[in-house]
Amino acid sequence: MSEKESPSPQHKKDEVVDDTEQETKDSEDDATKKMKIKEGSKFTMNSILSPLESLARVQQQLLKMAAAQSGFGGNGSGGNGANGFPYPARFATNCFSGPFPGYNGSQNWYNGNDARFAAAAALLPCAIDPVRSAINHQFSMSQRRKRRVLFSQAQVYELERRFKQAKYLTAPEREQLANSIRLTPTQVKIWFQNHRYKCKRQEKEKAMSGLGHGDDGCSPPPGDDDDDDDKYSIEMDDKDDEEEDGAKPMLKSNGVFGLPYPSPANAAAAAAAAAFNFQFGAQGPNPAYFMRW
């Protein structure tokens, strides 16, 4: 029976070398795959730090060149400090006078052709210019405000004639009058409000001057060139809606709770009547009054 041949030391050494080379190749393949995965992703540390690193290298080169040209050490040549770094330049602005390829050449940095910057630039003048925005706001406010409509002479004549007949119109009467003179019911309604206000103001002025009241047509005094009746004003409040839809309103007194202000004679008469009613009353003498005695 023949004995198995034992492997020689050289053969064992070759096998160990082959295993080591295979492991090295496997590790290199794994590292290459990882680097490809990292380079393919957009948000890796290399993709973020690569522009900064290139910028730092460019700045360092510029600093070295400036220190070599205008440094403090040697005969005009750049010297090194205690830590081995070059001395700073005399004029720091020379270091940053040239363009930075990290910003211009790299695609990772945004440039002016980006669509988002174009949209922001389109909105920027209106946002930072207060004068222009104020003018635009003023124009929009003036455009939204309604203009006053001028009435024709025939329309004013018909409105005044109807106002002499009745100072308050119901909704059907207002609509009928508006259709006859080619106006809207709202214009007729506000014209009546303005005309009533004008009549009250003129009556108050006449009462203060002692001239008395005018006629029902509220004719203006001589020299009064007020043209409020010839205009449709939207600034008046829409009051007297219920009064126009119903009958003529009752005159309002100036007293508290709708009562007139008491005079001394009226106060004495009211006190005497109250005392008499307490003593006797409507049904006879009041027992509570006589129980006091």
UniProtKB/Swiss-Prot annotation:
UniProt cross-references to Gene3D superfamilies, sorted A to Z: Homeodomain-like (1.10.10.60)
Annotated signal peptide: none
InterPro entries: HD, HD_metazoa, Homeobox_CS, Homeobox_NK-like, Homeodomain-like_sf
Keyword Thylakoid: no
Record SMART domains: HOX (SM00389)
SUPFAM superfamilies listed in its UniProt record: Homeodomain-like
Recorded name of the encoding gene: ceh-24
Tissue distribution of the protein: Expressed in the 8 vulval muscles, 8-10 ventral neurons in the head and in the most posterior pharyngeal muscle cell, m8.
Top-level taxon of the source organism: Eukaryota
Family: Belongs to the NK-2 homeobox family.
One GO BP: nervous system development
Protein role: Probable transcriptional regulator that is required in neural development for the normal formation of sublateral cholinergic motor neuron processes. Plays a role in regulating the expression of acetylcholine transporter protein unc-17 in the sublateral processes. In particular, it is required in sublateral motor neurons for a left-right turning behavior that occurs during the lethargus phase of the normal sleep process called 'flipping'. During 'flipping' animals rotate 180 degrees about their longitudinal axis.
Lineage: Eukaryota, Metazoa, Ecdysozoa, Nematoda, Chromadorea
GO (cellular component) term, any one: nucleus
DNA-binding region coordinates: 144-203
Compositional bias per record (Basic and acidic residues), positions renumbered to this chain: 1-15, 22-38
Keyword match Disulfide bond: no
Primary location: nucleus
GO molecular function: DNA-binding transcription factor activity, RNA polymerase II-specific; RNA polymerase II cis-regulatory region sequence-specific DNA binding
Descriptive protein name: Homeobox protein ceh-24
PANTHER family in alphabetical order: HOMEOBOX PROTEIN NKX, MUSCLE-SPECIFIC HOMEOBOX PROTEIN TINMAN-RELATED
Region (Disordered): 1-38, 203-256
Location in the cell: Nucleus
